[in-house]
């Protein structure tokens, strides 16, 4: 997909991002159990949320968290959510989301970015592996931790 760009989350784009139609079944993998447990420990000032736009249409959403002092290493530079509209999947939107979050992590002086996902076969593990993430551990809740060196 050509001409992808990021925009900060706004009232208008948030509604569109929340209305993205995913491939059936993907909504089950949007928020790993680990993130559900640690969400309250995040400093919202360190959260980076962007919509991904193609033309004038929101086709994706990415949220990451950057806090080099967080007590959980896998949450210091973490992709929190990558959502891509079903109609835009397989067209580079997810890759763009990860690359954009990686660039933001670098701007914070971080040398890696992590993602946490359910290890279920239908989860996003293959997607992250194709982008260069390697399995680097399992959370206390049984989710897979993947790390990408920047």
Which residues make up each language-model segment?
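Short coil/turn segments at alpha/beta junctions that flank glycine-rich nucleotide-binding fingerprints
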Residues: 91, 108-111
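Conserved acetyl-CoA-binding loop of GNAT-fold acetyltransferases
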Residues: 128-138
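Short acidic/glycine-enriched loop/turn segments that link adjacent beta-strands
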Residues: 121-122, 140-144
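Conserved acetyl-CoA-binding loop-helix of GNAT-fold acetyltransferases
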Residues: 90-103, 126-130
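Conserved beta-strand-loop-alpha-helix junction that forms the acyl-donor binding cleft
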Residues: 114-125
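Active-site acidic-Proline motif in GNAT/NAT acetyltransferases
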Residues: 85-87, 91, 120
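Acetyl-CoA-dependent GNAT
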Residues: 2-4, 8-80, 85, 104, ...
């Amino acid at each position: 997909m050509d001409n992808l760009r990021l925009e900060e989350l706004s009232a208008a784009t948030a509604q569109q991002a929340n209305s993205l139609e995913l491939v059936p079944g993907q909504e089950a993998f949007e928020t790993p159990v680990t993130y559900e447990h640690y969400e309250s420990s995040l400093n919202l000032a360190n959260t980076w949320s962007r919509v991904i736009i193609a033309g004038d249409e929101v086709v994706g959403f990415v949220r990451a968290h950057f806090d080099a002092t967080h007590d959980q290493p896998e949450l210091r530079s973490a992709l929190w959510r990558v959502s891509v509209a079903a109609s835009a999947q397989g067209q580079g939107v997810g890759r763009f989301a990860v690359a954009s979050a990686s660039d933001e992590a670098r701007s914070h002086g971080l040398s890696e970015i992590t993602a946490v996902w359910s290890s279920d076969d239908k989860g996003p593990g293959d997607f992250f592996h194709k982008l260069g993430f390697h399995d680097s551990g399992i959370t206390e809740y049984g989710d897979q931790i993947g790390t990408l060196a920047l």
